[in-house]
């Protein structure tokens, strides 16, 4: 059901590594003969089933399986996990909210025509901000009622960054703009040198940061878009930007990992790779976990760029740090528990034939598995 969805394609793109022999790497946004064969293989793949023993070795146990409502023939485009809820957006413009404790549907509604495209929604307090190409919905998370609906007059391409009463979007035309939600107008606009495909992030009380796919990096004053620091690299990114309030951390398609000073743009460090870095990196308590083809999974001192350890035999997305001693890592075809201090494999279990993985917290987080059949399964710490 999900093999054609944005959720699956994003998962495939961000977890494709030459060192990881995963079938996810065959998925792309352009349909070819080989893609059609891969789609046929995916369609005939056996349904995913829960390996309770394997999850137990990772220190997790199954808690529930839920089913976000979708329109007939629709697929899940976006999924986000929070402490208390999960949000889903289907290709039929259906937004659904499930209770994190039980998996029950809190509410579900179709916002627009089934052909309308939505970016990933974001939450602030009890409001969900869901944006289509040109409109922004503010929805009550309690019952799904519409609080406000605004036309933005611009084709957006990223999730919104919500700061006070501003919703900040990026576009394929390279425009980063702030929409003033209370009075329904575009407050400011800033032109980058190429398409913006990742959402802006807040780096301080006064500034946000964004990157174009041509490698232009800038911080802008949130209230007026006055330029702060700027930097330039040779490519954009397939992953979200990260910050600790000191550095801006980028996994770049120009085959490098970077850290830049958010104040003046000084490059703290750079780690090169022989391939574009496409796996989402993770920042936790002064350590950056990232994967490249050359070094596999790495633990990097975020301040200095020193590689504290690396394991060239594995690579993937670090979902959560558990018990302050282990990393839970999804490689694209298996889930692993990794020793946080040395990078050694503690436990592993196969995890194939799924559409995506989400967690609700970088520290001791729950793990949610989204299946091709349209279900979501929650696994909590034992």
Predicted regions and their residues:
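C-terminal motif of bacterial Sec signal peptides marking the signal peptidase cleavage site
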Residues: 23-26
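A short helix->beta-strand "capping" segment at the edge of beta-propeller domains
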Residues: 48-74
């Amino acid at each position: 059901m999900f093999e054609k969805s944005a959720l699956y394609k994003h998962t495939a793109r961000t977890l494709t590594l030459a060192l990881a022999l995963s079938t996810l790497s065959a998925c792309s946004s352009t349909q070819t003969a080989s893609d059609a064969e891969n789609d046929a293989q995916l369609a005939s793949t056996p349904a995913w089933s829960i390996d309770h023993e394997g999850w137990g070795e990772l220190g997790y146990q199954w808690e529930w399986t839920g089913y976000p409502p979708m329109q007939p023939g629709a697929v899940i485009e976006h999924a986000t996990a929070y402490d208390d809820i999960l949000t889903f957006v289907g290709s039929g413009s259906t937004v659904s909210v499930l209770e994190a404790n039980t998996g029950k549907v809190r509410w579900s509604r179709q916002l627009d025509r089934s052909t309308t495209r939505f970016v990933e929604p974001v939450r602030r307090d009890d409001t969900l901000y869901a944006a289509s190409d040109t409109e922004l919905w503010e929805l009550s998370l309690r019952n799904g009622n519409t609080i406000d609906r605004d036309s933005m007059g611009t084709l957006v391409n990223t999730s919104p960054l919500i700061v006070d009463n501003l919703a900040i979007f990026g576009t394929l035309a390279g425009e980063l703009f702030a929409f003033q939600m209370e009075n329904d107008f575009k407050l400011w606009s800033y032109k980058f040198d190429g398409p913006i495909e990742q959402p802006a992030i807040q780096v301080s009380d006064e500034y946000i940061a964004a990157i174009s796919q041509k490698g232009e990096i800038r911080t802008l004053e949130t209230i007026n878009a006055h330029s702060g620091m700027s930097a330039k690299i040779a490519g954009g990114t397939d992953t979200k930007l990260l910050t600790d309030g000191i550095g801006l951390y980028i996994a770049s398609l120009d085959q490098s990992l970077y850290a830049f000073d958010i104040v003046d743009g000084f490059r703290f460090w750079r780690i090169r790779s022989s391939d574009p870095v496409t796996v989402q990196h993770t920042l936790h308590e002064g350590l950056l976990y990232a994967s490249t083809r050359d070094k596999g999974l790495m633990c990097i001192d975020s301040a200095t760029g020193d590689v504290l350890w690396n394991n060239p035999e594995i690579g993937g997305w670090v979902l959560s740090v558990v018990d302050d001693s282990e990393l839970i890592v999804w490689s694209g075809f298996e889930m692993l528990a990794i020793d946080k201090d040395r990078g050694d494999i503690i436990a592993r279990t196969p995890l194939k034939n799924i559409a995506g993985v989400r967690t609700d917290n970088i520290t001791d987080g729950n793990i949610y598995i989204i299946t091709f059949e349209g279900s979501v399964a929650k696994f909590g710490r034992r």
